[in-house]
């Protein structure tokens, strides 16, 4: 029942934004979604399964949003460094607004948030080196970078650093920059942004995003 599943996740999200996850009751989530409690259990198996599914959904939405932020900035005429700064702005804003995303990025889970599912065994991770898991902040940081670079690909309709003519309307730097250099520069920039998630400072996001821009710009100019 995909529709019921979506409605239940939305109801669970609304519930955890209103009170700690430890105080959220399954019967209340089912009632808010307009389904029976049995339907909820059929979909998720229990509160732990519902919470893990909600965490996965919000983290995936966050990662998708990172790519969209880069795509929109690029299509607006921003160069690669400014596009990374746009991704950093999305990261800071979302981590501040969504406690579950903040917990996934920092690894600091508590009673106010549901817990992610357990990560797969190391042998499975070895076959999926660039897949994200909410319980693994290090892997999440890698995938965050991948999604940002993929946002440039979508904006230009051409793999960054790939062959072929320069895309119309896209910055020339996107084609000329080798993917490996861009990947490393973006990872450095986004890890700076993540440091502000772990240890935030007062004031607007323009200052940390400006530092991201400066670092990425310097790395790409080497």
Predicted regions and their residues:
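Basic, helix-initiating cap at the start of DNA-binding domains
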Residues: 1-32, 49-52, 57
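Actinobacteria-biased recognition of intrinsically disordered, low-complexity terminal regions
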Residues: 1-13, 17, 76, 119-121, ...
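An amphipathic alpha-helix signature
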Residues: 9, 85, 89, 141-153, ...
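Short hydrophobic/aromatic patch on the recognition helix
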Residues: 33-44
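Hydrophobic alpha-helical connector segments
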Residues: 53, 66-100, 167
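Short, basic, alpha-helical segments at the C-terminal edge of helix-turn-helix-like DNA-binding modules
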Residues: 56-64
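Amphipathic alpha-helical packing segments from all-alpha helical-bundle domains
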Residues: 63, 103, 112-176, 180-187
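Amphipathic C-terminal alpha-helical segment
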Residues: 93-97, 150-162, 187-206, 218-222
């Amino acid at each position: 029942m995909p529709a019921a599943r979506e409605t239940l996740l939305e109801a669970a999200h609304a519930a955890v934004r209103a009170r700690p996850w430890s105080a959220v009751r399954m019967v209340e989530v089912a009632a808010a979604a307009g389904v029976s409690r049995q339907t909820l259990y059929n979909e998720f198996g229990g509160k732990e399964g519902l919470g893990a599914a909600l965490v996965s959904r919000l983290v995936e939405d966050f990662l998708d949003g990172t790519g969209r932020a880069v795509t929109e900035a690029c299509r607006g005429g921003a160069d690669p460094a400014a596009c990374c700064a746009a991704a950093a702005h999305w990261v800071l804003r979302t981590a501040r607004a969504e406690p579950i995303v903040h917990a996934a990025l920092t690894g600091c889970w508590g009673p106010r948030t549901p817990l992610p599912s357990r990560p797969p065994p190391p042998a499975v991770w070895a076959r999926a080196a660039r897949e994200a898991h909410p319980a693994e902040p290090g892997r999440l940081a890698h995938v965050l970078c991948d999604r940002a670079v993929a946002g440039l690909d979508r904006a230009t309709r051409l793999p960054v650093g790939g062959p072929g003519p320069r895309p119309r309307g896209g910055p020339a730097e996107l084609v000329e920059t080798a993917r490996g250099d861009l990947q490393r520069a973006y990872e450095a920039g986004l890890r700076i942004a993540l440091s502000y998630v772990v240890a935030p400072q007062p004031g607007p996001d323009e200052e940390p995003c400006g530092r991201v821009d400066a670092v990425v710009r310097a790395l790409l100019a080497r």
